[in-house]
């Protein structure tokens, strides 16, 4: 019989020291009274890996692989025909409304996203994907595609780019066509596209070797930003946008792992607060209550809500088993006969062995006893995971299914949540810690692997991430105590710490600008926020000279950028309120150089190395952003068949009119960074008269396909590559003009927004 949910005032609540009902593992009949770490997040892996086993038995699987780690379990890809159909496809244009932070924020016209049949015959050619979608959707060759279907395909193409398989091979997501009907129905109603991700159960219990504690940290923060960015990227091609729903499986597994329900609650509530505080409006959450069709009742206080949750947690687990248990399912038989289940089981054994190591070391003296206990837990998790997957399928069938585990992509898309090597799922936030390196790299690692090379950083008294040990982060020797806050997807904010009513913020005169400059090479943009005297011109120029050699403008050292009010063709778009194209500073700055061998004199482009800003006044909230696109991240997410090596050979030209009237040719698309040697983008976005009253810019790819221009434009605005930076009055900002491209969004006429800028080398 299904337990009836109780009113919180009448609920009998079980606490961590009291006996609990457990159907599977007698060894966890009583919860430890002082559990300080939450148990492993196998949960989210477990929730999905064994799903739909009954439907999967008919598939031909590849031979079993070696045991895999918790982050590297593969579903074997089903055989598929990757050859291209010979179907001729007419051009299809998808209307693309502008998002609030798109440079065309004030434009009234939609920008077309066009799929064209260029006869490339490759999986990377979008027209091939459209062919497959047309055939699946309409069932006949040459049948027309509706505007709603075209929009749905554009949405799914955005989701596809987050897939690990797509990153590895550049091939189409197998499940794309199967989700077209689902997305089309939402597009017809002009609803946000809905995605669901079973994940975020609770932290691994192994705080000795893997994680930093039981609460969300920088790993979860990055993951939520990443998921919200996926939705924002969808909003660039479909105005209603998208939402991703996190369905936590914490309550599905925590009892068999000995994790208190209270630990699951605290972790989940902290995630929700994080999403609200960071204004990640597209990240939403589904409780197990709702998945089992019990409404989550709004309660007057946090304590009342917690009591209600704890009172019904065990009831929900029983109901999940009662409604979705497959009585015919034999976990042992499935492990022996089904490849997916076997791989999942091996993965569980792998990470359970490490996650439970501190407990096993004290509870079991023999390796054999430890192995038997872990195997029992793994089998139980497979059973629970199958139930949870069935509940999701039954109650959220109209959601696009995301996964944190590798799969062939037929029914879900495998994505990574935190920065990883290209094409690798890597560790989840609840199985790892984040390491921030001095070169700007963010890595998901096990804590034991970086404790010697990195220092532990706290936020609000909580261990939050590891930061590489470097003099660049030691400002105490300069007489300052500061906090370093990594931004997503790039950038760093530095704030003074130890400030109160009796200790005012330090002046910028004390800032170690040589360290700021070095940090900006890998961590641009570097923002100095909360310091005094940022708007004193003489002091501002002095700090610029400490950064490097100042490169004056023709009119002086400082360019003060604000809306000049001009609207004629010869006005400078920089001193307007218009959005601007993505670019680097110094496009039109040339110097004559003499070849030491031939004596030939050439005009050579000499852009400044760095920019130094301060902000006297801001635009209204939600406008006037400065966007910074990272070359490092651009090449990380560059989709196949495009490669760094291919782009390094590309040259391009531009034809400008108006204020910037000039024709430039033979410009390299990629240049090496003068310090790191890493490839960096040199680009100016095409900008026609529909986007501006001022100078237009036509761009030509000189020695490769013109399609590359659209690829570059799209990726430089991708939320995985581009930081949308919102200014605060008094901010100082240093950006590496080689490593970063930048632009701004539009803002209201007569707005007081003003930035000062100095170039230096």
Swiss-Prot record:
Keyword Oxidoreductase: yes
Compositional bias ranges of the Basic and acidic residues kind: 115-126
Pathway listed: Secondary metabolite biosynthesis
Residue ranges with Low complexity bias: 36-48
GO MF terms held by the record: oxidoreductase activity
Principal EC category: oxidoreductase
Gene ablation phenotype (knockout): Abolishes the production of xanthocillin derivatives including a dimethoxyl formyl xanthocillin derivative, the sulfated formyl xanthocillin derivative fumiformamide, a 1,2-diformylamido derivative named melanocin E, and the imidazole-containing melanocin F.
Induction text: Expressed during copper starvation via the regulation of both aceA and macA transcription factors.
EC number of this enzyme: 1.-.-.-
SUPFAM superfamilies xrefs: Clavaminate synthase-like
Extent of Polar residues compositional bias: 93-102
Keyword flag Kinase: no
Lineage top rank: taxon: Eukaryota
One Pfam family recorded for the sequence: DIT1_PvcA
Keywords from the UniProt entry: Oxidoreductase
InterPro entries per the UniProt record, alphabetical: Isocyanide_synthase_DIT1, TauD-like_sf, TauD/TfdA-like
Ranges for region Disordered: 24-128
Record function comment: Isocyanide synthase; part of the gene cluster that mediates the biosynthesis of the isocyanide xanthocillin and its derivatives. The first step of the pathway consists in the conversion of tyrosine into a vinyl-isonitrile intermediate by the isocyanide synthase xanB. Subsequent oxidative dimerization of this intermediate to form xanthocillin may involve the cytochrome P450 monooxygenase xanG, whose expression is coregulated with that of XanB.
UniProt similarity note: Belongs to the isocyanide synthase family.
Name of the molecule in the record: Isocyanide synthase xanB
Upper taxonomic lineage: Eukaryota, Fungi, Dikarya, Ascomycota, Pezizomycotina
